[in-house]
Amino acid sequence: MSLLLSVVISILSFGAIANNDSINNAGAINRAISTCAQQGGGTVRVPAGTYVTGSIYLHSRVTLRLERGAILRGSARLADYAPLQTDMDLSRYESGQGTVNYNSATDPQWSRALIFGVGIHHAGIEGPGHIDGADVRNPLGEEHMRGPHTILLAGCSDMRFRDFSITRSANYAILAYQIAHTQFNALTITGGWDGIHVRGACHISISRCTLHTGDDALAGGYWTDTRIDRCLINSSCNGIRMIMPSERVYISRCRFEGPGTHPHHTSGRTATETGIYLQPGGWGKAPGRMDQIYIDRCQMYNVLTPVTVTLGDDNTAGTISINRLTGRKIGHMALSVKSWGTAPTDRVIIRNSDIEYIGKDDHSLPKWFHGKSFDQWPFFPSWGMYFRNVHTVKLHQVKLRLSGKDYRQAILYDHVDHVQGHATLATD
């Protein structure tokens, strides 16, 4: 599509009215988007002002541009939000079966959203404006309170989201199923539950985003060829949480900072748990192999543990590589790669990394673990690193620092076939 021939339309031309909380502008905005698409595509402008709206539908080859000072604010009426409508089979992405956290794309309560992109391509949203999810609660939603997602994508490709902000999401800021060749760039997400949650992705990138979320900042799984780069991540749960196996994932130059600035809605906590949590099968069956996970030049500050890998019984793992990881004020939970059953990891490579832990000054800890089953452990019997069911662990120029006292051993290997290299220990 030629930029010289593309259409530029304002939502004002279709009857949108700013700064009036009693008006639902969804009809006007959707007419503008539809008209732009019918004319071959282009840009739909949202001028400065606050526009209250229910569900909006993106179309192929149309960019929704939020001008400076423009705010799309979700309607306060739950009835103004539609559920996802699609013929796609998304059942493999269901999770939390049998719990209050069960979610399914076919559930009309779970799949409500403010902005939809379904089966479209070459479309997206750009700033520098703002989207306000309005924190609309739904007593029939997950945990009996979660409301509509702010943006929901399904079966989309070649999408671009950049240079805008999202606040007060009533559930996830962005939820996506089966997307490809999609970019999330320079987004600022504040509050709500998960920030960007993608289930099923091929060739996506998340870069230069700033996330201050109550739940996991970035999450999902079944990713291939995914890049997460130069993001600032602050969470009252986990920074990055992969709950389904993925391959060729590159996480680089991200900074993880705790505690969270926005409390977790359910528990009220603000402590950041794991910087990067790779947990296929953690929220229900998610069979498959996780492989080629590369973590490079990331910084962790004031989190419980920097990296955790836990395989489910239906999973295996190939290579997990960690390079130039820096950690400061890490809690008393060791970096770990393990499975509690027999699921194997082929190799873990950790290089050029420097992690400082806060010690747990308790003489009785080493003996406490004797005879205890794994599910009774509140943390690991080692303070720095813990490996279980790994074929090969390679350590090169790794320094583990201990602030304070801790009587546990620094590193523990359980059912590890080969260990190459060692870590340098530095204690107070």
List each model region and its residues.
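Extracellular/periplasmic carbohydrate-active domains that bind, remodel
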Residues: 5-428
